[in-house]
Amino acid sequence: MGTERSNVLKVSDLHVQVQTKDGASTLVQDISFELKKGKVLGLVGESGSGKTVTSMSILQLLDRKTTKIEGSITLQGRELNGLDDKEIREIRGKDIAFIMQNPMNSFTPVFTIGNQFIETIRSHTSLNKKQAKELAIDAMQNVNLPNPAKLLKSYPFQLSGGMLQRVMIAMAACLKPSVIIADEPTTALDVHNQLQVLRHLDKIRSEYGTSILLISHDLGVISEMADDVVVMQHGRIVEIANVFELFDNPQHEYTKKLLNARLSINLEEPIAHML
């Protein structure tokens, strides 16, 4: 019973198919894993392995007209798969938040940061505009953004990629969701901003007990951030292990290949020793 309570997010036998003109095509199959409270679960694999499809399925963001999602996805015991649009919108942003790889894609260019941030808060709370603005400013201060009141008046194109990503993290964390899904959150950033983003994610996890599903191809990031790791290949899970066990004693040949590829190109890891 205690294990069940500690599993904030549970995915069981997830199977996703997309309809094409040539018939049904399987994107992921037999996907099962659990994310515990206050833990970071790394989801790794090469491009096309099914990582993003898995995260989009959890968030119920795939096109339901062309995509069939089978299996169970529970968030704190509540089944997400099959919820209608209104029900899932109430959950997304409040109970489960999403940080995209490219922060510019997360914002509408014709509205200010403040307009989008404040409306996101108000759509999930009973706060008035002034209260929502105060919460937004507080959340932005927590991720060390300078002059939040001024930033709220800015448009997305006026901010750097690193600053936009920190705004996204502030938006994701401000309502203290039980789960944050971070899909390659550092890929588009320089080393300095990568470090800042990872530090803020770790701070959110430790302060709020937020669970994080961290999707990344960067094994250096995974080795420093994750408690457990899920390795995907061709739409399937090939290995699940504690992060230390995975790096010290990988079992599957594909996992060994990923680790060997990382070593063979002699990656510099400026982030790893600084977190």
Indicate residue ranges for each PLM-predicted region.
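Helical segment within the ABC ATPase nucleotide-binding domain
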Residues: 195-208
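Conserved ABC transporter NBD signature motif
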Residues: 68-79
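A short, proline-enriched helix->beta-strand linker immediately N-terminal to the Walker B motif
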Residues: 174-178
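Catalytic Walker B motif of ABC-type/P-loop ATPase nucleotide-binding domains
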Residues: 180-183
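A short, surface-exposed alpha-helical micro-motif characterized by mixed small hydrophobic
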Residues: 222-224
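Short catalytic/signature loops enriched in Gly
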Residues: 4-7, 24, 146-152, 240-275
